C-alpha cells in the first residue's frame, strides 16, 4: 500500500510539473504548414498545438469555431478536408479566407445578443471585413473596431481534440489571451 501511495504521489508530482511547464500564455507549436490563424496563447490545448480558426465539424461547414490545430499530411491537396483549420488573412481585402475551400470567407452573423461566425462565399459584405493589428494582435470587425474576434474561456472536448467557440466581444472587456491572434502566411 505504501509503495502504491508513493507511486501515486510521484505521478501526481510529474503531472503537476508538466502542467506548470506549459503555461496558458506560452505560444503554441502549430503542427501544420501555413497559412493558419492561431490564438497566440496556447491556453489549455493538451498537445501544445494551439487553437486555430476552423470550420465546425469535419471538412467544409457553414459555421466556424476554434479547434486544436491539426497536423499537416505530406502531399495533401489544397482542398483536402483535413485542412479545415487553415485560414489566411488578406490585408488588401480585409477578409479571413478559407485555405482549402477557396472563395469562402469568415462572416460575422450578428443578431440581438448573439453572434456566430459563418463560412460563406466571399463578398463585399461589411461583416466579412476585419482589421488585423500586428501591434496588439487583435482582429477587429472593420465596421465597428471596438469589437474583436475572441474565443470562449472554456475548452470543450471534440473527439481526440478540443475546441472553443468564436465570439465577437467588446475588445476592452476581454483578456488579451482570449483575443490575440497570430497570422502565419505561406
Q: Model-flagged regions — what are they?
A:
Residues 15-17:
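C-terminal motif of bacterial Sec signal peptides marking the signal peptidase cleavage site
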Residues 20-186:
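Lectin-like carbohydrate-binding module/patch detector with strong preference for beta-trefoil
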Residues 4-13:
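Sec-dependent N-terminal signal peptides
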Amino acid at each position: 500500500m505504501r509503495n502504491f501511495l508513493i507511486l501515486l504521489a510521484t505521478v501526481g508530482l510529474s503531472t503537476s510539473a508538466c502542467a506548470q511547464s506549459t503555461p496558458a500564455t506560452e505560444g503554441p507549436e502549430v503542427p501544420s504548414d501555413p497559412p493558419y490563424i492561431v490564438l497566440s496563447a496556447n491556453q489549455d490545448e493538451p498537445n501544445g498545438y494551439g487553437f486555430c480558426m476552423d470550420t465546425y465539424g469535419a471538412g467544409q461547414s457553414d459555421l466556424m469555431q476554434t479547434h486544436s490545430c491539426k497536423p499537416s499530411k505530406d502531399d495533401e491537396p489544397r482542398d483536402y478536408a483535413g485542412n479545415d483549420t487553415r485560414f489566411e488573412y488578406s490585408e488588401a481585402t480585409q477578409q479571413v479566407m478559407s485555405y482549402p475551400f477557396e472563395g469562402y470567407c469568415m462572416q460575422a452573423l450578428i443578431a440581438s445578443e448573439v453572434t456566430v461566425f459563418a463560412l460563406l462565399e466571399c463578398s463585399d459584405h461589411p461583416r466579412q471585413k476585419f482589421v488585423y493589428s500586428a501591434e496588439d494582435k487583435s482582429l477587429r470587425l472593420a465596421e465597428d473596431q471596438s469589437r474583436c474576434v475572441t474565443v470562449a474561456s472554456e475548452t470543450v472536448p471534440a473527439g481526440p481534440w478540443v475546441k472553443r467557440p468564436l465570439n465577437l466581444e467588446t475588445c476592452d472587456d476581454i483578456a488579451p489571451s482570449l483575443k490575440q491572434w497570430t497570422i502565419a502566411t505561406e
